[in-house]
Amino acid sequence: MRVCYTYFQTLIECGMMRCAINEGERLLKLSEGDSLGVRYQLMHLYAYTEDEMHALALHQKYGGYEETQMLLPLAILYYKQNQFDKAKDYLNRLAKVNRDTKKFMRLEAKHDGYSLRMEQGMYGYRPGTIEELVDAYLNSTYLFNATPYFSQWAYQYLRTQTASKKKKPKNEE
C-alpha cells in the first residue's frame, strides 16, 4: 500500500494529474478506511481539474463531513468555475470548522511562505487549526499555484464578513 501511495505522490509531483487521479481512486478501492489521507489529495486533484461531479461524490462517500481538507478544495473548485456564491458558501463553512481560515488566507495572499511554514506543526497537525490549512497547502501547492488570486479573493470576502458581523447591533432584551 505504501509503495502505491509513493507512486501516487510521485505522479502528482511530476504533474501527471489524470494518472494520479486514477491511482488515487484505485488506492481508495484498496483501502476504504483511507489511513493515508488519499481522499484529501484526491479532493485537491478534483478541484485542480475542475471535476465537480467526482469531488461532490467523494465528499458524500466520506459522510459529507465538514472537514477543512474537503471544504477548502471545494471552495477553490467553485472559484475556478466562476460560481462565487457557492465558493463563498464553502468558505463560510470552512471558517466555521477552522477558526484560522482568515489568518491562513491573509498569509497565503501575501505569499508569506516563511510565516506559513512557521505555523506548520512539527508532528503533523491539529484539526481545525492553521496547521491543518498549512498541511493542505503544502501537500497541494499545485492547486494554489493554479489559482494565484483565490487567497486574496477569499481573504477579502472573509474580512468583509467579519466587518459586517461587528457592525450588526446586538438584540437587546
Identify the meaning behind each predicted range.
Residues 17, 51-52, 84:
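TPR-repeat structural position
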Residues 25-32, 58-68, 92-101:
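Solenoid-like repeat scaffolds
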